[in-house]
Amino acid sequence: MPIGVPKVPFRLPGEPSAQWVDLYNRLYRERVLFLCQDLDDELANQLIGIMLYLNAEEKSKDLYIYINSPGGSVTCGIAVYDTMNYIKADVTTICVGTAASMASFVLAGGTQGKRIALPHSRIMIHQPEGGSRGQASEVLSESEEVMRIRRQVGKIYAQRTGQPLRRISRDLDRDQFLSAREAKDYGIVDQVATS
């Protein structure tokens, strides 16, 4: 039987007593967000909305995004990345399990010096996928768009990791799995957390 989302006590500033709120709402108040499932439109919009709200509330305090995700939509990942870089608050990204595909892109998109992987994390990069059906002109158009996005993603990875674009392009050709230490050496994260 599922237990649901746990409730925890939380006292709002100026309130005499605590209220019971769900764990995630409590953590949002501490500027902690989660990317722990497939990155789809709904999750991307939630993350973007929360980041914009928390940034408007306090621009000088860091946001923390904990990542354990197989990835998801390329356009959603780019939207989250763009928002992370649009807001004034620094964004610390932390891989707590797996950051694959667009989740690794979000991980790499954290503020330089504040991208962390736990010691047994796995990070995977690969090229964006696309699939189309229909008339030849539609398939060609979709293919051109996928290649444009691939170039865009490759340039961003190169910028964020310090790796040459030629190497990034080669590495994106197939799934590249990295340990936390390898991800640090590659430049996707800045540090491997220790206890």
From Swiss-Prot:
PROSITE patterns reported in the protein's UniProt record: CLP_PROTEASE_HIS, CLP_PROTEASE_SER
Positions of disulphide bridges: none
Annotated InterPro entries: ClpP, ClpP/crotonase-like_dom_sf, ClpP/TepA, ClpP_His_AS, ClpP_Ser_AS
Sorted UniProt keywords: Chloroplast, Hydrolase, Plastid, Protease, Serine protease
Molecular function per GO: ATP-dependent peptidase activity; ATPase binding; serine-type endopeptidase activity
EC number assigned by the record: 3.4.21.92
Compartment list: Plastid, Chloroplast stroma
GO cellular component: chloroplast stroma; endopeptidase Clp complex
Active site: 101 (nucleophile), 126
Catalysed reactions, semicolon-separated: Hydrolysis of proteins to small peptides in the presence of ATP and magnesium. alpha-casein is the usual test substrate. In the absence of ATP, only oligopeptides shorter than five residues are hydrolyzed (such as succinyl-Leu-Tyr-|-NHMec, and Leu-Tyr-Leu-|-Tyr-Trp, in which cleavage of the -Tyr-|-Leu- and -Tyr-|-Trp bonds also occurs)
GO biological process: protein quality control for misfolded or incompletely synthesized proteins
Record's subunit section: Component of the chloroplastic Clp protease core complex.
Role of this protein: Cleaves peptides in various proteins in a process that requires ATP hydrolysis. Has a chymotrypsin-like activity. Plays a major role in the degradation of misfolded proteins.
Family: Belongs to the peptidase S14 family.
Name of the featured protein: ATP-dependent Clp protease proteolytic subunit
Organism of derivation: Oltmannsiellopsis viridis (Marine flagellate)
